[in-house]
């Protein structure tokens, strides 16, 4: 047992004692920080520990409302499993053209791999098919609409207000209508905001959320495992599962972006709090895949982290049995869940380590020292940002980083 002996020395801590100590610290954090659970510093070693799921407290109305909201959203990707919708989608996809483009791109990746002495190309035919779909979808099929042009004279329009949908528009899933006026002829232009992928597939225009809605459905039409990804800060995109790389890949059909998870905070300066991926297989908190800096993480105040973990498991248990009825498939998906959870926690640990090194170097420079971070260029220290190929493992005795983090000490 660890502790001080009579001679004033100390016994070494074995793994069991360390585990018990972490568990006690975990439980203490849960009890003492239930109301002030987000203004905490993160210990990298503790961050690598899994979150313990817990249901929303009976008096936590905000967490209960968040639970209901996420469960409601989890039904959206289930609409993509409609056989009639998928058949209609397949009729609109130029399969021969996309397949030919995919074959040509696969050959390029194979040639590149051979020139580098690698036996495995970066992407397989499956991913190249999605890449071809992405190019066709953004460039030829779906149109981004800010202010719709006047249907009478094609002149620009200005928005007046939101109005209620007509019965016909409502029947086609419009929840509201944006009303615009032509700057030239004064004619009114209605822009219904549809929610169903079926109707969006027909009108072929919309904004970022509409792009993600339809593109994710088209991936399912090609029998690609796909997720509809929701960001609380008003943005949506897609993830597809790469069998070739055994991981989920970021796809933004509105920006024609492929495997660029850090695009939002690096290129846009976008800060995010919750990023949740939904599919027929369940729900996953993938925030750490897209927030590559503690400074880009907004307060996560909707519920405790343990409650969010509970909600994710609740949604998964709600939908997965229907689409993964056999034990072999469930076991495979469970193993994927575990691997992804480890990857996401590792990504965040590496992010904190990078931030700690940069802050230490900045402090040394301010004192007149010459210390600099190992990564002088500021490049991502995690190797591939999506794979989590961490180059600098965090030691167990790593110091507490002097950066504020909104992840609680008892979980990532």
Curated annotation (Swiss-Prot):
The keyword Zinc applies. Keywords: Metal-binding, Zinc. InterPro entries: Papain-like_cys_pep_sf, PNGase, Transglutaminase-like. Pfam families: Transglut_core. It comes from the Eukaryota. Residues 363-412 are annotated as: Disordered. One of its GO terms (cellular component) is cytosol. Coiled coil: none annotated. The keyword Zinc applies. One of its GO terms (biological process) is glycoprotein catabolic process. GO terms for molecular function: metal ion binding; peptide-N4-(N-acetyl-beta-glucosaminyl)asparagine amidase activity. Zn(2+) binds at residues 150, 153, 182, 185. PANTHER family: PEPTIDE N-GLYCANASE PNGASE -RELATED (PTHR12143), PEPTIDE-N(4)-(N-ACETYL-BETA-GLUCOSAMINYL)ASPARAGINE AMIDASE (PTHR12143:SF19). Belongs to the transglutaminase-like superfamily. PNGase family. This is Protein png-1. It comes from Neurospora crassa (strain ATCC 24698 / 74-OR23-1A / CBS 708.71 / DSM 1257 / FGSC 987). The lineage of its organism: Eukaryota, Fungi, Dikarya, Ascomycota, Pezizomycotina.
């Amino acid at each position: 047992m660890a502790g001080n002996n009579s001679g004033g020395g100390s016994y070494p801590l074995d793994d069991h004692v360390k585990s018990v100590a972490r568990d006690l610290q975990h439980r203490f954090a849960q009890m003492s920080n239930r109301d002030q659970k987000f203004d905490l510093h993160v210990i990298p070693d503790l961050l690598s520990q899994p979150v313990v799921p817990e249901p929303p407290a009976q008096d936590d109305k905000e967490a209960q409302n968040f639970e209901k909201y996420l469960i409601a959203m989890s039904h959206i990707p289930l609409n993509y499993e409609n056989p009639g919708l998928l058949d209609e989608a397949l009729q609109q996809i130029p399969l021969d053209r996309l397949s030919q483009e995919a074959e040509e791109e696969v050959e390029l990746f194979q040639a590149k791999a051979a020139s580098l002495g690698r036996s495995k190309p970066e992407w397989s035919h499956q991913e190249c098919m999605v890449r071809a779909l992405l190019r066709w979808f953004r460039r030829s099929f779906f149109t981004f609409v800010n202010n719709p042009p006047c249907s009478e004279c094609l002149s620009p329009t200005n928005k007046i207000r939101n109005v209620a949908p007509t019965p016909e528009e409502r029947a086609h899933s419009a929840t509201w209508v944006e009303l615009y006026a032509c700057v030239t002829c004064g004619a009114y232009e209605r822009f219904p905001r549809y929610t169903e992928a079926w109707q969006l597939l027909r009108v072929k225009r919309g904004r970022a959320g509409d792009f993600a809605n339809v593109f994710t459905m088209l991936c399912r039409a090609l029998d690609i495992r796909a997720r509809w990804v929701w960001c609380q800060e008003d943005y949506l995109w897609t993830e597809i599962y790469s069998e070739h790389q055994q991981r989920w890949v970021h796809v933004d059909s509105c920006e024609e972006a492929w495997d660029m998870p850090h695009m939002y905070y690096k290129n846009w300066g976008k800060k995010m709090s919750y990023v949740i991926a939904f599919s027929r297989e369940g729900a996953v908190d993938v925030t750490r895949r897209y927030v590559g800096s503690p400074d880009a993480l907004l307060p996560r105040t909707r519920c405790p982290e343990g409650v969010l973990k509970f909600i994710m498991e609740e949604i998964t248990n709600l939908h997965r049995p229907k689409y993964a009825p056999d034990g072999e498939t469930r076991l495979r998906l469970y193993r994927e869940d575990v691997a992804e959870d480890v990857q996401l926690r590792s990504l965040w640990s590496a992010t904190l380590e990078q931030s700690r090194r940069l802050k230490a170097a900045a402090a040394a420079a301010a004192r007149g020292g010459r210390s600099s971070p190992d990564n002088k260029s500021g490049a991502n220290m995690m190797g591939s940002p999506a794979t989590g190929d961490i180059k600098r493992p965090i030691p167990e005795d790593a110091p507490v980083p002097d950066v504020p983090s909104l992840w609680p000490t008892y979980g990532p």
